[in-house]
Design a protein with these regions (language model features):
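Periplasmic polypeptide-binding modules associated with outer-membrane biogenesis and secretion
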Residues: 1-174
Length: 174
């Protein structure tokens, strides 16, 4: 006969629910399972969820050792998805990574990507609030002891070709 109820699957589901709650700022969330046998072949699984206090963002700071990027981060601060008074939300942090890397690319930092935007979340000073430090830094090259910097690129000269010029140019390349 097929197995309908699996205790391990129920515990795994409880762990997934707890993990989801933590991404929404409920860092002390607990989820337990309770099963009841109603009939011979019928089981009811209840998930008891205690969310705890949902953390609120008290402070957001932006930091980059490159002065030009630091100035841009300060300029873009008002566009941030992370706002004082909002609940902590991992989706907003991911959106913030994407926003910063896109803005940097639009400013000529071609190699900017979401993985250069890091977060330090401090939950130690208050049980209900947290502070977030948004840091932009390049990964350090293991062969080089100097700090890596993000290179800015400029497009100096360009020429617009009409379709026929482009067609002739492409044929010439072959």
């Amino acid at each position: 006969p097929p197995e309908i109820y699996d205790k391990n699957a129920a515990q795994q589901t409880a762990a997934q629910i707890a993990a989801l709650l933590k991404t929404k700022g409920c860092f002390n969330a607990t989820v337990t399972t309770d099963t009841t046998c109603v009939k011979k072949n019928y089981v009811v699984a209840n998930y008891n969820v205690t969310t705890g206090m949902r953390r609120i963002i008290d402070e957001v700071e932006f930091l980059c050792r490159q002065q030009e990027i630091q100035a841009l981060l300060e300029e873009w601060k008002s566009e941030s998805f992370l706002k004082k008074g909002d609940y902590y939300d991992q989706e907003k942090m991911t959106a913030e990574q994407n926003r910063i890397s896109t803005n940097l690319k639009n400013q000529g930092y071609y190699y900017a990507s979401p993985d250069i935007v890091h977060f330090i979340v401090d939950t130690t000073y208050d049980s209900q609030q947290l502070s977030i430090l948004v840091s932009v830094r390049m990964r350090r090259n293991l062969n080089d002891s100097t700090a890596a910097t993000l290179q800015k690129y400029h497009i100096d000269n360009f020429e617009l070709l009409d379709f026929l010029q482009l067609f002739h140019f492409l044929i010439f390349l072959q």
